[in-house]
Amino acid sequence: MAAGCLGGQRAGPLSGTVLGNRWAWLIALPLLLAAAAAQGSVCRLKTGDGRESESCGTNLELEHSFELDDSIDFKKRGSLFWSGTAEQSISILQKQLTEDERNKLRDIANLNGLYRIRIPRKLGISEEVNEYVTSFVRACSMVESHLSDEITVHTDISGNVIGVSIVTFPGSCNGAEVEDVDLEMFNTTVHIQQPIAAAVPETAAFIERLEMEQAQKAKNPQEQKSFFAKYWMYIIPVVLFLMMSGASDAGNQGGNGGGGGGGGGGR
């Protein structure tokens, strides 16, 4: 994959004419975009607030397949433009379905067939050895949604493509009649789904709080004593008093029992 964008190609022989003439630059831009897109890297010219700026990113080819015999034959559906900014935005440019494609999609929907899409996992590699990620929906849901779908590109934490998914709105098949004009243009929303980092344990804060508690205990050693160590001088007298009271009660009960037995023997 070639490195850099069009911004790095302005120092060539065209710089004196292309940059010096705004209209010449606008005419030459599509040719330069096509050359860059073939290498997987592309830049786009944006106009806003009276100023022009470039947005560089990656061009991913989106392909689809829907065949009557349930075979797989992917053909180009459009292109995904993946910006290289920190926001990781993504947009899509798609082809219009031909009359033959619309008729074939209807036939496949009637046969309860599948509609498949795929995008490449890596750039700068020939199609013969490239790897793809794929997804599919029922062709009937694609028809009854009037080609309204949502495509999500899943990436790892480094931004590498690891999967793709597609859903339609609505996603059910109810046998509704669909006009031919509703199957001409795709109405697609695209997203990038990156992994959400797990919550990091607050180890430093926990250690700091633990050290503060230990320092506080060192200043107040009295707080470290147990309940018995703090109040033993009150507990022991109470225990001794209870023990002595119990022994005295037991002696009185024994004396009363002996006297009663002696009286019974005198009769």
Curated annotation (Swiss-Prot):
Keyword NAD set for record: no
Gene: emc10
Source organism, top-level taxon: Eukaryota
Subunit (UniProt): Component of the ER membrane protein complex (EMC).
Protein's UniProt name: ER membrane protein complex subunit 10
Role of this protein: Part of the endoplasmic reticulum membrane protein complex (EMC) that enables the energy-independent insertion into endoplasmic reticulum membranes of newly synthesized membrane proteins. Preferentially accommodates proteins with transmembrane domains that are weakly hydrophobic or contain destabilizing features such as charged and aromatic residues. Involved in the cotranslational insertion of multi-pass membrane proteins in which stop-transfer membrane-anchor sequences become ER membrane spanning helices.
Organism encoding this protein: Xenopus laevis
Keywords attached to this entry: Endoplasmic reticulum, Membrane, Signal, Transmembrane, Transmembrane helix
Compartments, as annotated in UniProt: Endoplasmic reticulum membrane
GO cellular component labels: EMC complex; endoplasmic reticulum membrane; membrane
Statement: the UniProt record of this protein carries the keyword Endoplasmic reticulum: yes
Side of membrane Cytoplasmic, spans: 248-267
Span of the signal peptide: 1-38
Protein family: Belongs to the EMC10 family.
